[in-house]
C-alpha cells in the first residue's frame, strides 16, 4: 500500500510511529509542515520536519516529544551570557548541529527537499520525508498588546507568549507564490490513501493544504483524518487558540466541518464524540489517546481500516 500522511510536529510524529507499526510493508511518504520554520542566530530551524525525523529515527526526547534525547544547552547558555536574543526559544547543542548542516546546505544552493533528504540519510526514519514546499513560507500571527496591533512569527506567539494573547489573524506568509516541493504532488498522485493525523488543523495540516495544488491533489484521493480534539479540548498543545482565531469551534465536529466533505472521506473521533457527523463523511469512534506504542499502532490501524471501508 502507498500511504501519504500530512504531518505537523509532536502529534503527527507519534502517529506516524504507530502507522509504521500498523503497516510495516507499506510505502509511506510524509509531507511535513514548514510554516513553523524560523531563522534563529543565522540558522534555519525546521521544528516540525526535525520532530518527525528525530521521532522516527530514534533520537527524540520522548518525555517532551520535541528536541533531542540526552540534550545539553551549553551554547544556549553562552549565547544568553552575551545577551543574544531571542532567549525564549531553546536550541540544544545536539540540535544546533542539525541546523548548522541545514543552513550551510541551503546557503550552498541546495533546496530544502534535498537538504531534508540528506539529513534523513543519517536518521533513517523509515519513511520518505518531504517538506511541503522548498519556498520560504512562515506562519505569522496578528496580535494586539501594549505595543499595539502587530504581526509576530508563529513561534513567538506559540513559545514565548504560549498563545495567551488572542490571535486576531493567522496567515501563511509566502503561500500564494509557493509551489509544492519536488515529489509532493507525485506522491499524492500515486497514493492509495492519504491520512491526516491528529496534528494542529490550522497551523500544521491547514498550512500544508494552503500550498497551491496540494488540497486538490489530496481531495482527489481516499482521505481519512484523525480528530485532534477529544471532548472539546485538544489532545495536546493549544489548537483551541488557533481554532478560535479562525472562528471554528473547538470540537471534533468543528474540525470535521473545517476540513469539509470535499476533502475527507472518513473521520475518526473519540468515543465521547461519537455523535459527530457530516453528510458524505464516514465517522467512526475509536480510542484516540496515543498513550502507548500499542494504542498508537491500533489507532493507525483503525484509520487504515476506515480508509479501506470508504474506498470499497
What are these regions (language model features)?
Residues 168-187:
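Active-site glycine-rich loop that binds ribose-phosphate moieties when present
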Residues 236-312:
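C-terminal functional extensions of proteins
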Amino acid at each position: 500500500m502507498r500511504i501519504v500522511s500530512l504531518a505537523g510536529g509532536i502529534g503527527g510524529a507519534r502517529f506516524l510511529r504507530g502507522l509504521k507499526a500498523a503497516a510495516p510493508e507499506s510505502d509511506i511518504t510524509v509531507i511535513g509542515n514548514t510554516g513553523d520554520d524560523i531563522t534563529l542566530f543565522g540558522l534555519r530551524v525546521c521544528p516540525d520536519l526535525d520532530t518527525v525525523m528525530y521521532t522516527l529515527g530514534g533520537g527524540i526526547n520522548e518525555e517532551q516529544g520535541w528536541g533531542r534525547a540526552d540534550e545539553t544547552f551549553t551554547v544556549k547558555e553562552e549565547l544568553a551570557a552575551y545577551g543574544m536574543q531571542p532567549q525564549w526559544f531553546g536550541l540544544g547543542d545536539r540540535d544546533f548541529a542539525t541546523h548548522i548542516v541545514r543552513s550551510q546546505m541551503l546557503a550552498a544552493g541546495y533546496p530544502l527537499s534535498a537538504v531534508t533528504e540528506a539529513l534523513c540519510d543519517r536518521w533513517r526514519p523509515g519513511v520518505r520525508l518531504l517538506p511541503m514546499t522548498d519556498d520560504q513560507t512562515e506562519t505569522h500571527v496578528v496580535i494586539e498588546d501594549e505595543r499595539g496591533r502587530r504581526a509576530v512569527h508563529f513561534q513567538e506567539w506559540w513559545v514565548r507568549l504560549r498563545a495567551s494573547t488572542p490571535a486576531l489573524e493567522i496567515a501563511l506568509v509566502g503561500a500564494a507564490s509557493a509551489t509544492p516541493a519536488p515529489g509532493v504532488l507525485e506522491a499524492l498522485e500515486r497514493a492509495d490513501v492519504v491520512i491526516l493525523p491528529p496534528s494542529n488543523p490550522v497551523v500544521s495540516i491547514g498550512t500544508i493544504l494552503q500550498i497551491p495544488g496540494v488540497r486538490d491533489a489530496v481531495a482527489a484521493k481516499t482521505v481519512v483524518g484523525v480528530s485532534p480534539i477529544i471532548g472539546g479540548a485538544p489532545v495536546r498543545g493549544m489548537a483551541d487558540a488557533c481554532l478560535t482565531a479562525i472562528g471554528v469551534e473547538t470540537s471534533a465536529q468543528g474540525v470535521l466541518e473545517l476540513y469539509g466533505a470535499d476533502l475527507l472521506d472518513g473521520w475518526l473521533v473519540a468515543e465521547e464524540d461519537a455523535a459527530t457527523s457530516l453528510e458524505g463523511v464516514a465517522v467512526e469512534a475509536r480510542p484516540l489517546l496515543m498513550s502507548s506504542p500499542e494504542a498508537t499502532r491500533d489507532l493507525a490501524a483503525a484509520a487504515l481500516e476506515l480508509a479501506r471501508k470508504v474506498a470499497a
